[in-house]
C-alpha cells in the first residue's frame, strides 16, 4: 500500500519553467538630427551617423538583448530608412538579428514606402519568429500633408508592433515600440498616450498574451500625459514598480537619466524613455551609459539616448 500511495494520490504536475527574455529600448537618434547638430556646431563630428554606427552596433552587441525597440531610426525629411550600415555592422560582430521597419504609407509591407522617424524592432533570429505585425497612428492623422490647420507635422506619431513566438517553447507575446510628441505639445502627447493605450488594448485583448510597450515618450514623470500611463489597468512601468518594491540599485535611484545632451558631454535630466509590461515577471532594470569608440577612436556615447534594458520572465 505504501508503494502504491503516490500513484493513488497522483503526482503533482510539474510546472514548465518560465522563459527568460532580455529587452531594450534604444533611441538611436536619426541621422538627419545628428547632421544638423554637427553643422550648427552643437555636436562634435563623432556624432554623425556614419561615425557612430559602429559604436551603436557595439553597444547593442555588448548588451546582448533578445528583442530591441529602436526609436528615431528613420529620417522624416528625406522620407527614408535611417539604419544605413547598422544591420551589416551587427552581422559583422556576430549578432544575428532580424529587422522589422514599417513604412507610414504602406504599413503592411516592411521596408517599403515613406518614413516619418518610424520605430524599428529587431530580434534574435534563432530565438523568435515574428508571426504578426503592423503600424498604428497615435495622433489621429494619417497624411501629414493634409493636417488640420494649426496642427504640427509631428502629430503623425506611430506605434510599431509585432507578435512573437518563442521557437523553443511556442510561447507568444506582443512587443510594441512608440514615440510621442512630448513636452513641446502636452495636449497632443496626452492624446498620443490615450490612443496608444486604446490601440494596445484592442490588439492584446484578442488572445490575452503577455505584452510589452516601450518608447521614447518624451515626457517626465511629473507630466500630465504620464498619468495616462499610470492609469493603465493592464500595463505597469518597470522602473516605477521596482522603485516601489525597493528593488532598484542605489545608482539607478540617484541617476535615472536616459539621455545625454547633443554634444555628448553629459547626461540630460529626466527619464523620457519607458518600458511598460503586462504578464511578465521582472528580474532587472538598467540604463546603459557606457561610451564606445567612434570611427576615429574617440570614446563617445553612441547616441543621444541610452539603452533602457529589462530582463523579464514569462
Per-segment meaning from a language model:
Residues 9-93, 104-111, 116, 194, ...:
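N-terminal, active-site-proximal structural segment of metallo-dependent hydrolase catalytic domains
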Residues 21-28, 56-82, 122, 162, ...:
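Active-site beta-strand/loop signature of hydrolases that rely on acidic residues for catalysis
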Residues 69-71, 100-104, 212-216, 237-241:
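Active-site neighborhood of phospho(di)ester-bond hydrolases with catalytic His/Asp-centered motifs
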Residues 201-212, 219-314:
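Metal-dependent phosphoester-hydrolase catalytic domains
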Residues 1-6:
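Bacterial N-terminal signal peptides
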Residues 20-42, 131-136, 161, 171-182:
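Active-site-proximal beta-strand elements of phosphoester/diester hydrolases
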Residues 73-172, 287:
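Structured beta-strand-rich core segments of catalytic domains in phosphoester-bond hydrolases
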Residues 28-32, 73-77, 105-109, 127-128, ...:
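Solvent-exposed loop/turn segments at secondary-structure junctions
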Amino acid at each position: 500500500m505504501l508503494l502504491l500511495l503516490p500513484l493513488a494520490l497522483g503526482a503533482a504536475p510539474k510546472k514548465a519553467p518560465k522563459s527568460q527574455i532580455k529587452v531594450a529600448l534604444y533611441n538611436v537618434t536619426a541621422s538627419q538630427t545628428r547632421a544638423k547638430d554637427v553643422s550648427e556646431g552643437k555636436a562634435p563630428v563623432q556624432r554623425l551617423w556614419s561615425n557612430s554606427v559602429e559604436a551603436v552596433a557595439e553597444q547593442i552587441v555588448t548588451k546582448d538583448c533578445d528583442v530591441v525597440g529602436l526609436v528615431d531610426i528613420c529620417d522624416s525629411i528625406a522620407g527614408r530608412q535611417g539604419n544605413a550600415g547598422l544591420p551589416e555592422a551587427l552581422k559583422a560582430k556576430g549578432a544575428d538579428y532580424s529587422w522589422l521597419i514599417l513604412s507610414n504609407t504602406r504599413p503592411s509591407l516592411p521596408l517599403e514606402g515613406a518614413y516619418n522617424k518610424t520605430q524599428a524592432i529587431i530580434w534574435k533570429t534563432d530565438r523568435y519568429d515574428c508571426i504578426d505585425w503592423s503600424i498604428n497612428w497615435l495622433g489621429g492623422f494619417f497624411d501629414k500633408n493634409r493636417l488640420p490647420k494649426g496642427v504640427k507635422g509631428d502629430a503623425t506619431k506611430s506605434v510599431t508592433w509585432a507578435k512573437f513566438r518563442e521557437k523553443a517553447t511556442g510561447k507568444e507575446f506582443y512587443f510594441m515600440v512608440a514615440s510621442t510628441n512630448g513636452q513641446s505639445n502636452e495636449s497632443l502627447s496626452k492624446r498620443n498616450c490615450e490612443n496608444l493605450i486604446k490601440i494596445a488594448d484592442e490588439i492584446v485583448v484578442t488572445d490575452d498574451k503577455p505584452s510589452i510597450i516601450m518608447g521614447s515618450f518624451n515626457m517626465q514623470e511629473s507630466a500630465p500625459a504620464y498619468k495616462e500611463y499610470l492609469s493603465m489597468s493592464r500595463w505597469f512601468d518597470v522602473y516605477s514598480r521596482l522603485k516601489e518594491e525597493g528593488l532598484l540599485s542605489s545608482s539607478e535611484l540617484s541617476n535615472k537619466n536616459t539621455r545625454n545632451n547633443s554634444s555628448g558631454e553629459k547626461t540630460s535630466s529626466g527619464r523620457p524613455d519607458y518600458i511598460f509590461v503586462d504578464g511578465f515577471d521582472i528580474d532587472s532594470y538598467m540604463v546603459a551609459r557606457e561610451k564606445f569608440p567612434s570611427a576615429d577612436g574617440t570614446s563617445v556615447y553612441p547616441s543621444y539616448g541610452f539603452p533602457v534594458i529589462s530582463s523579464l520572465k514569462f
